[in-house]
Amino acid sequence: MTPLPRRQAVSIFLVFAFAYFISTLIRAVTATLAPTLVTEFSLNARDLGLLAGGYFFGFALTQLPLGTWLDRFGPKRVILGFLGIAVVGAFAFAQASSFQWLLASRVLCGVGVSACLMAPLTGYRRWLAPENLMRANSWMLMVGALGMVASTLPVQWIVSVAGWRPLFIALSAMVALAMVLIYLQVPHWHAAPTSVSSQSTASRGYGEVWRNPYFRKMPPLGFFNYGGMVAMQT
């Protein structure tokens, strides 16, 4: 497919980057809010760990079917559907009155932002020139890192001025704004005939990946290295 004009490609990158920035901010924000949540809800270390893990549980639930959905429905439809869940999750977190409510809201947030990186990367393969792909992918990761940075001192300042509940209402509104921008800027996806696969075909594909000897060496690295890193960050 012919790459999109430069101006349109930049617009698409910016709206996707905005959504990914918010998603990583939401991911890491509980670490900054931990003292406040401990005081207000009488949480212990286990509860804080569950809040962080709840996000990743929701995130992980969608990853296997996500690739099939992206190929079949396209980045625009998939990310809009998921971000709608993130809006609900962030708003529900702001209204929480118990630990169970907080945890359920974090799971919804994890589900809701779980396509914020893979949907753009899928679209970039079709919409950007090949020589710009690596640059766009690396810039997306940089924007995600900035989102985690924004969850530290900036969030501490906002919480001291307005409180953590208004913060999550604002995050919910920002996700809704990202949805509007994506709806307006991102083109529709015309699936290629070969991209529509049945569930059984997708399952066989996952099986082939799992049986690959090289792949089976990778999960321990991800579990201990990346898992340890995000545990420290969240």
Predicted features, each with a name:
Residues 30-31, 214-234:
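Extracytoplasmic gate region of multi-pass secondary transporters
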Residues 1-5, 189-219:
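Juxtamembrane intracellular "pre-TM" segments in multi-pass secondary transporters
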Residues 28, 56-64, 148-149:
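Residue-level signature of mid-helix packing/kink "hotspots" within the transmembrane helices
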Residues 11-45, 232-234:
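Extracytoplasmic
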